[in-house]
């Protein structure tokens, strides 16, 4: 039986062998692994990119005080990002399942069409959910747009739900019963955090502070974009997005206001995406093959 940390190590070794740079989690609250700069920003422009990383993910509304066996406000995703998306990306994914110990002939693996969209980040793509014996464990996406900008070449993203994969591999029905490593369970590591963070998310966050924080992060992001600093600006966008999610968890935002807030974050994300693209362009897209860069600049002329 693979422990939770052994599953992570196996995926890291597998994607490293496929030529991916093994990166570390982004050190801020994000609602999905896609929000890591290694995906959101690196999907822009002509520069090739191959990376893999674990990303802790926070979704305040999904907290259940540690009482739900498979729903958490904090959990883990594993991301593999391949740009341009290789023609054999599905085969590479199936190879990763074999690496984890799945017998592809003995398990029901289905690719269910499910195009992906993140309205907050102005991103969308064509894709599939991967169902393993009736449970969704992975999302495939071919990015079409990020920050409202067309992606060329197309980036392929594979997002694994680590807890779900581990629950199947370990044969448990409760996420807290997962073996993290010998002598240590997922409950030992994270149950108290789920309980306390749920109380914070749903009852003890300071609404006045959060509304003020959102406005401050929004203003700071705009200022940083104007100063030509897209990376710090993007961090402010992520802070604004997490603050919005906390307000949403408290029910402090009406349906009408919710759409308006999402629109404000999306506009920030778009401005950051454009600023980042221009910053790489000024550098001459240093990671791109010369012929790609020349073709792009000629079309823009």
From Swiss-Prot:
Keyword set, alphabetical order: Aminoacyl-tRNA synthetase, ATP-binding, Cytoplasm, Ligase, Nucleotide-binding, Protein biosynthesis
SUPFAM superfamilies: Class II aaRS and biotin synthetases
An example molecular function term from Gene Ontology annotations: ATP binding
Gene3D superfamilies: Bira Bifunctional Protein, Domain 2 (3.30.930.10), Class II aaRS and biotin synthetases, domain 2 (1.20.58.180)
GO biological process assignments: glycyl-tRNA aminoacylation
Keyword Repeat among UniProt keywords: no
Domain of life: Bacteria
Enzyme class: ligase
EC number annotated for this UniProt entry: 6.1.1.14
CDD domains reported in the protein's UniProt record: GlyRS_alpha_core (cd00733)
Family: Belongs to the class-II aminoacyl-tRNA synthetase family.
Protein name, per record: Glycine--tRNA ligase alpha subunit
Protein source organism: Nitrosospira multiformis (strain ATCC 25196 / NCIMB 11849 / C 71)
Taxonomic lineage from the root: Bacteria, Pseudomonadati, Pseudomonadota, Betaproteobacteria, Nitrosomonadales
The gene coding this protein: glyQ
């Amino acid at each position: 039986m693979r422990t939770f940390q052994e599953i992570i190590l196996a995926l890291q070794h597998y994607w490293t062998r496929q030529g991916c740079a093994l990166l570390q989690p982004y050190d801020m609250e994000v609602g999905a692994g896609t929000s890591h700069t290694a995906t959101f920003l690196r999907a822009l422009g002509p520069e090739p990119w191959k990376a893999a990383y674990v990303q802790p993910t926070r979704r305040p509304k999904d907290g259940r005080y540690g009482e739900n066996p498979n729903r958490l406000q904090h959990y883990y995703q594993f991301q593999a990002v391949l740009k341009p998306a290789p023609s054999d990306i599905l085969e590479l994914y199936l190879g990763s399942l074999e690496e984890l110990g799945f017998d592809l002939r003995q398990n029901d693996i289905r690719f269910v069409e499910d195009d992906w969209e993140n309205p907050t980040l102005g991103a969308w793509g064509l894709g599939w959910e991967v169902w393993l014996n009736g449970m969704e464990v992975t999302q495939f996406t071919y990015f079409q747009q990020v920050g409202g900008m067309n992606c060329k070449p197309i980036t392929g993203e594979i997002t694994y739900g680590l807890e779900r994969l581990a629950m199947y591999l370990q044969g448990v029905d409760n996420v807290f019963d997962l073996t993290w490593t010998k002598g240590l369970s997922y409950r030992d590591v994270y149950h108290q955090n789920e309980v306390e963070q749920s109380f914070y998310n749903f009852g003890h966050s300071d609404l006045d502070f959060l509304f003020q924080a959102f406005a401050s992060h929004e203003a700071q992001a705009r200022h940083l974009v104007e100063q030509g600093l897209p990376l710090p600006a993007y961090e402010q966008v992520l802070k604004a997005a997490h603050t919005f999610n906390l307000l949403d968890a408290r029910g402090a935002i009406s349906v009408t206001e919710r759409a308006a807030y999402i629109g404000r974050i999306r506009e920030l994300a778009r401005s950051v995406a454009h600023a980042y693209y221009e910053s790489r362009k000024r550098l001459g897209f240093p990671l791109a093959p010369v012929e790609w860069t020349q073709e792009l600049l000629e079309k823009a002329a």
